[in-house]
Swiss-Prot record:
Role of this protein: Single strand-specific metallo-endoribonuclease involved in late-stage 70S ribosome quality control and in maturation of the 3' terminus of the 16S rRNA.
Family: Belongs to the endoribonuclease YbeY family.
EC number: 3.1.-.-
Cofactor binding annotation: Binds 1 zinc ion.
Cofactor: Zn(2+)
Name this polypeptide is given: Endoribonuclease YbeY
Binding-site positions, Zn(2+): H118, H122, H128
UniProt cross-references to NCBIfam families, sorted A to Z: rRNA maturation RNase YbeY
Annotated organism of origin: Mycobacterium leprae (strain TN)
Gene Ontology BP, a term: rRNA processing
Length: 178
């Protein structure tokens, strides 16, 4: 699986986290592991231009998705067997996302993870134009975000425990006997 990130926004964001959450969603949604995804981070002026050009809406937005191939997403009950493909592009605007994060009382990292999930789901065919679609998509993106955060916490705790174990083994002189 290939996830490429191009940060043209001038904002300092964790590209590692963006790749991590995108990969997590792709795996959870049962997309072929050979799938490719491109992510671009833009400043507000560039995002406003893109928003006007593609959606005919003024001003910047937080996330836009541009599917490359038309296919049924994996992970849905009615989906065909997923195959390798270029999923498409997700365009994020960190500056706009930072404003949303502040308004919601959470971190920029949290907001960008949520927007990445939202963007991937759009690439997989999910939409929120109708109330039922919105309910399904937003519930799924909330669940995926919770699961990704829980996985990150477990990985962090595992790493801290490994560090403690290694320090203890070095202090005990255990490694001197190997």
């Amino acid at each position: 699986m290939s996830v490429e990130v191009s940060n043209e926004s001038g904002f300092d964001v964790s590209e590692v986290e963006l790749v991590s959450v995108a990969r997590f969603v792709i795996i959870k949604m049962d997309v072929n592991p050979a799938a490719e995804l491109s992510m671009v981070l833009l400043d507000t002026a560039a995002m406003a231009d893109l928003h006007m050009r593609w959606m005919d809406l003024p001003g910047p937005t937080d996330v836009m998705s541009f599917p490359m191939d038309e296919f049924e997403p994996g992970g849905r009950p009615d989906a065909a067997e997923p195959g390798p493909s270029m999923l498409g592009d997700i365009v994020l605007c960190p500056e706009f996302a930072a404003q949303q994060a502040a308004a919601e009382g959470h971190s920029l990292g949290h907001e960008l993870a949520l927007l990445t999930i939202h963007g991937v789901l759009h690439l997989l065919g999910y939409d929120h134009g109708e109330p039922d679609e919105e309910k399904e998509m937003f519930a799924l993106q909330g669940r995926l975000l919770e699961e990704w955060v829980a996985e990150q916490v477990r990985a962090y705790q595992h790493d801290r425990q490994n560090e403690k174990d290694c320090r203890l083994l070095y202090k005990s002189g255990y490694f001197g006997y190997l």
